[in-house]
Amino acid sequence: MLNEFIAIRRELHQIPETGYKELKTQAYLLDYISKLPSEHLEVKKWRTGILVLVKGNNPEKTIGYRTDIDALPITEETGLPFASKHPGNMHACGHDLHMSIALGVLTHFASKPAKDNLLFVFQPAEEGPGGAKPIMESAEFAEWRPDSIYGLHIAPEYKVGEIAIKPGLLFANTSELFISFKGKGGHAAYPHLANDMVVAASAFVGQMQTIISRNIDPMDSAVITIGRIHGGEIQNVIAETAYLDGTIRTLSPETMQIVWTRLKQLAKGWEEAYQCEVEFHPGSDYYQVDNDPVETEEFIHFLEEQYPESYVPARSAMTGEDFGYFLSEIKGFMFWLGVDSEYSLHHAKLSPKEEAIPFAIDVLIHFLESK
């Protein structure tokens, strides 16, 4: 028989929605939650997200568990019979698995409450513009604010049954980068009468990499990636505007500040050198995921005792996750859950092995019961 929560994952996989547009997803989750035993449950909506409090039998604290619920603007290429029914959107980062795991854990505790309160946070907009910080600042979250909080993320590179975690920094600080260049367009035959923004933007791409090689401590780490460049509209017209879209990733907030300071200093020089206007446009900023050492070591000990073949020491990664905002104020941790897929996160053919779902549910139930 197909595991109930694998079936739920497949249903959620078909209705992927991007940040703050998760209306069908929210409705699906609310419908499922409404059918659970309600004696110990309280439910609140927050925008397109949901908070569910499971009242404990003799509570002295509140333990939080967070799952993200949004998808990516990617056209799915898996060929699965339960592929996305929303053209251009896909659960290409595993949030469908995250949700089904959270529902599995919630289902257990709705019928068998723990000693302490449990808060389940179904958070929208992790992929952007970032839902963690605003939901943390909400009155709904403040009323049930947990004393600790946990989360997971699927990892295609690990096998099913493996859990990778480490104390301290797990995910990097990330910042979206949107830059526009405005100069003077003109005829391709008369470049001396124009200010070519394709040239200006192209040169800026190369020069910004010297920030990494010459302004960042070699023992530290940072990366600037430009994933999209656009300039001009036709081949025989000098471009009046050009645009660069990318990301910055660093292992500390201080290094992120250095990168931003140098980028803005470079931009001022570019305006003089290329006779143009350079403007930075706001994007999402995600704080590093910094696992609490005591909480993490406790979880590692739990794994070694209860699931001795599962624990894998993790390495810090340059990936970003807005769960870091929770951990900046509340003790807890995030871990990687192995799903053994040949395709990476954010790939149109990502197809995680679903056996990871019942495994993760079992681990989390036993861990939370041990708290």
Curated annotation (Swiss-Prot):
Gene3D superfamilies in UniProt: 3.30.70.360, Zn peptidases
A GO MF term: N-acetyldiaminopimelate deacetylase activity
Q: Which organism is it from?
A: Listeria monocytogenes serotype 4a (strain HCC23)
Enzyme kind, highest EC tier: hydrolase
Q: What is its EC number?
A: 3.5.1.47
Q: Identify which residues the record assigns to the active site.
A: 68, 127
A GO biological-process term: lysine biosynthetic process via diaminopimelate
What protein family does this chain belong to?
A: Belongs to the peptidase M20A family. N-acetyldiaminopimelate deacetylase subfamily.
Q: Which UniProt keywords apply?
A: Amino-acid biosynthesis, Diaminopimelate biosynthesis, Hydrolase, Lysine biosynthesis
Query: Its function?
Result: Catalyzes the conversion of N-acetyl-diaminopimelate to diaminopimelate and acetate.
Which Pfam family is one of this chain's hits?
Peptidase_M20
Catalytic reactions on record: N-acetyl-(2S,6S)-2,6-diaminopimelate + H2O = (2S,6S)-2,6-diaminopimelate + acetate
Name of this chain's protein? N-acetyldiaminopimelate deacetylase
- Name the InterPro entries on file: AcetylDAP_deacetylase, Amidohydrolase, Bact_exopeptidase_dim_dom, Peptidase_M20, Peptidase_M20_dimer
Pathway in which the depicted protein is active: Amino-acid biosynthesis; L-lysine biosynthesis via DAP pathway; LL-2,6-diaminopimelate from (S)-tetrahydrodipicolinate (acetylase route): step 3/3
